[in-house]
């Protein structure tokens, strides 16, 4: 069976990592762009001429050259919304970055799927106009992702057996949540 990586290119952005490694937080979007373009140029040197200066342009050109769309994973997408809430420049730059990545129909030509993790709800933020085409799932509303949020009871039971732990004791310690029809930990 073919995995996701066999069909689509992947691009992972860990926003907390970028924030932790940038020398000046006000340059975070430029740093994300610079690092992402450097990584893409390493892999797709023939498809990215020097004048390519934005991530969306790079992804579009790679898709044109290879025919393959991307799966975009942005881990802790909301860290700049939370940690830099008082810095309007960072907020504006980041929202414009997200808008460039996801707004409108153009990104659908080179992005097959975008998966953003975070603790803040997308639709209730000022980013709504930048991120209004996402389906939002959470622990309170897991939808079809219920079995992927946390560990299912069957997975915890199997791990307990594998590592010689008492399942009932682990169950009492962690209690878990009921998401849809799934008991998760």
Task: Describe the role of every protein-language-model region.
Residues 61-63, 92-112:
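Substrate-engagement module of ASCE P-loop NTPases
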Residues 3-8:
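Short, small-residue-biased leader/transition segments that mark boundaries at the very start
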């Amino acid at each position: 069976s073919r995995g996701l990586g066999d069909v689509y290119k992947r691009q992972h952005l860990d926003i907390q990592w970028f924030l932790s490694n940038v020398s000046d937080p006000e340059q975070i979007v430029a740093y994300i762009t610079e690092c992402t373009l450097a990584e893409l140029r390493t892999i797709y040197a023939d498809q990215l001429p020097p004048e390519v200066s934005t991530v969306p342009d790079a992804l579009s050109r790679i898709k044109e050259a290879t025919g393959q769309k991307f799966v975009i994973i942005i881990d802790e997408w909301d860290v700049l919304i939370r940690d830099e809430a008082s810095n309007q420049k960072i907020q504006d730059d980041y929202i414009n970055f997200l808008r460039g990545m996801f707004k409108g129909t153009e990104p659908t030509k080179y992005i097959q799927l975008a998966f953003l993790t975070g603790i803040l709800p997308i639709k209730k933020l000022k980013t709504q106009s930048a991120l209004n085409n996402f389906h939002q799932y959470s622990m309170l509303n897991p939808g079809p992702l219920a079995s992927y949020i946390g560990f299912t009871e069957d997975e915890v039971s199997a791990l307990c057996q594998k590592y010689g732990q008492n399942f009932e004791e682990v169950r009492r310690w962690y209690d878990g949540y009921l998401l849809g029809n799934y008991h998760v930990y």
